[in-house]
Curated annotation (Swiss-Prot):
Active-site residues from the entry: 266
Domain Ubiquitin-like as annotated: residue spans: 1-81
Alphabetic keyword roster: Aspartyl protease, Hydrolase, Protease
Keyword Protease: yes
Protein name according to UniProt: Protein DDI1 homolog 1
Family statement drawn from the similarity comment of this UniProt entry: Belongs to the DDI1 family.
GO biological process: cellular response to hydroxyurea; proteasomal protein catabolic process; regulation of DNA stability; regulation of protein stability
Name of the gene: Ddi1
Residue stretches of biased makeup (Basic residues): 110-124, 398-408
Keyword tRNA-binding part of the UniProt annotation: no
One Pfam family cited in the UniProt record for this chain: ubiquitin
Length: 408
């Protein structure tokens, strides 16, 4: 089996190498092989695997659970002074995730065998696990756990995964890291550690004075709630990272009165609507029955100018009858609501990414993001536009009839 060894020497230099060994290979012989590759004397070498120190030289590597493709950490005794990895009674494990739990993708996650390349080192040698932890800054451990900002900085810069986590969860520290100034990075890091220490001291004071005090109980409850939220988010980021992305809305190509349009398919909308500007381009404003005007209320309010009782909409080769409620201000041209979808027995097939017209049997593909109208594209500065879309969606679900509006 192939074992990768991450070695930290006495002078803090690092080297990584791989060794081809058998599962029944004894630990003492493995140390000798590591000495040939790293120059670290076998008697000074400490081997760490899955946060556990391997001590019995007469045990085989297989008995420790090592398998093909695994990684171990080799630390030199004298300068490193390795302590047993994991939590100790007085000092919590280095964890900067804001939840008290391991960052997704580390060896203490729910599936440790899938994340075998993250380990704890000595307090002077922050491990990859600790570097992962820098990704939030919410839950900083004691400053003495990490007294080498230069080493932390170099480890983060050399690991793209850790750097991406840092950008997501601790933008301030990431900005200091990418500035290229070690002094700035050290200041931000130490400041966050100090803030964490002060928070821990405050919580300890509350616990020690009167743990049954109403204010203390409220603080404890809030602390537990925040930890549960962070843990839930961390699990979601590990198990379902796609849930943090945005999805493109469902649009199709269509034509009204010969004019090509991009229609938003919304099965949650009560009725099919069209913007005033689009109705003017399609030359159907002359058919608007203003007796059906009113105010639509939902997330916001919009004025309904009236209704076009009958028009034709072309989807692929099919010409379908449709009615439109005309809204005065709307970001999208046309929205196909439940009235039109039910009328033509349409079904949304997300597996095939098509809209199926039940009455004709034809289907049309939903548009990719690159072909969406500007108001629907997933751009960083479009929060307001997306909010407008949601407003329209809510607006058409709760129409309020005007004085002259008739009942459907």
């Amino acid at each position: 089996m192939l074992i990768t060894v991450y070695c930290v020497r006495r002078d803090l230099t690092e080297v990584t190498f791989s060794l081809q060994v058998n599962p029944d290979f004894e630990l003492s012989n493995f140390r000798v092989l590591c000495e040939l590759e790293s120059g670290v004397p076998a008697e000074e070498a400490q081997i760490v695997y899955m946060e556990q120190l391997l001590t019995d030289d007469h045990c085989s590597l297989g008995s420790y659970g090592l398998k093909d493709g695994d990684m171990v950490v080799l630390l030199q005794k004298d300068n490193v002074g390795l302590r047993t990895p994991g939590r100790t009674p007085n000092h919590p494990r280095a964890d900067f995730t804001g939840s008290g739990s391991a960052v997704p993708g580390t060896s203490s996650s729910r599936h440790p065998h899938q994340h075998q390349h993250h380990y704890h080192h000595h307090q002077r040698i922050p491990s990859t696990q600790q570097a992962h932890g820098l990704a939030s800054g919410e839950n900083m451990t004691f400053a003495q756990e990490l007294d080498s900002p230069a080493l932390i900085r170099s480890m983060l810069l050399s690991n793209p995964h850790d750097l991406s986590l840092l950008k997501e969860r601790n933008p301030a520290l990431a900005e200091a890291l990418l500035s290229g100034n070690l002094e700035t990075f050290s200041q931000v890091l130490m400041e966050q550690q100090r803030e964490r220490t002060l928070r821990e001291q405050e919580m300890f004071r509350l616990y020690s004075t009167n743990p049954f005090d109403q204010e203390t109980q409220a603080r404890i409850e809030e602390e537990i709630r925040q930890q549960n939220i962070e843990e839930n988010m961390n699990i979601a980021m590990e198990e379902a990272p796609e849930s943090f992305g945005q999805v493109a809305m469902l649009y199709i190509n269509c034509k009204v009165n010969g004019h090509p349009l991009k229609a938003f398919v919304d099965s949650g909308a009560q009725m099919t609507i069209m913007s005033q500007a689009c109705a003017e381009r399609c030359n159907i404003m002359r058919l608007v029955d203003r007796r059906w005007g009113g105010v639509a209320k939902g997330v916001g309010t919009q004025r309904i100018m009236g209704r076009v009782h009958l028009a034709q909409i072309q989807i692929e080769g099919d010409f379908l009858q449709c009615s439109f409620s005309i809204l005065e201000e709307q970001p999208m041209d046309i929205l196909l609501g439940l009235d039109m979808l039910r009328r033509h027995q349409c079904s949304i097939d997300l597996k095939k990414n098509v809209l199926v017209i039940g009455t004709t049997g034809s289907q049309t593909h939903f548009l990719p993001e690159g072909e969406l109208p500007l108001c629907a594209k997933l751009l960083s500065g479009t929060v307001q536009e997306e909010s407008s879309d949601r407003e329209v969606g809510g607006t058409i679900k709760h129409p309020v009839k005007g004085p002259g509006r008739k009942k459907h």
